[in-house]
Amino acid sequence: KMEKNLKIGVIGAGIQGVCSALFLQKKGYEVILFDREEPGGSAASSGNAGHFSPYASIPLNRPDILTDIPAMLLSSTGPLALKWNHVPKMIPWFLKFLKNCSTKNMMHTAKYMHQILDIALPAYDELFEEIDLSGLVENKGIMYIWNDQNLKSRELEYNIRKEIGAEQQLLNKKEIHDLEPNIKKIYHAGVFYKKARHTRNPGKIW
């Protein structure tokens, strides 16, 4: 248990740093926030997607990513790029990454990530009660859609989230267009995460 007369330093004035500092203040601690910029500046928290994603508990290093890596590296528009002269320095990290791609390690991470994310929204709500968020946060959920009718491309993710207890709803073609009538009728399957939220402007929140 920490003494209340301690001064606590929090490094980084992004959304995580600001939230950590505020909760420490609410518990009675004196907090100093360190950053090169003022909160709400131009760092990562101002340029993120603005999603509150309680479903996002599955780590990147998972069994099926191993078969995707070669195609990612060879594609000029792929999401993965390497500076080959840096590869020798990356080998220790990459070996640890591969080790954690096992189903056992992936499920271990997903389980505990879910426990953290499950309490994240109530924690945000506690902070948001103290600031004016008029028109900034939408509680409309988020929908992922695919033109693959049997949803095989996302079967692993769906089953993992089902096992750890994440709230999700499978959608058919009709349900997709009931939720979003303006989407082209080429999508046959989807998943809806009702508890997800988004903000219109991440920078204005903190």
Go through each PLM region and give its residues.
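Residue-level preference for short coil/turn positions at secondary-structure junctions
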Residues: 4-6, 11, 27, 47-48, ...
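N-terminal Rossmann-like FAD-binding beta1-loop-alpha1 element of flavoenzymes
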Residues: 6-33
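Hydrophobic/aromatic ligand-binding patch that stacks against planar heteroaromatic rings
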Residues: 19, 23, 51, 160
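Glycine-rich FAD pyrophosphate-binding loop
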Residues: 26-46
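Glycine-rich active-site loop/strand segments that organize a redox cofactor
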Residues: 47-115
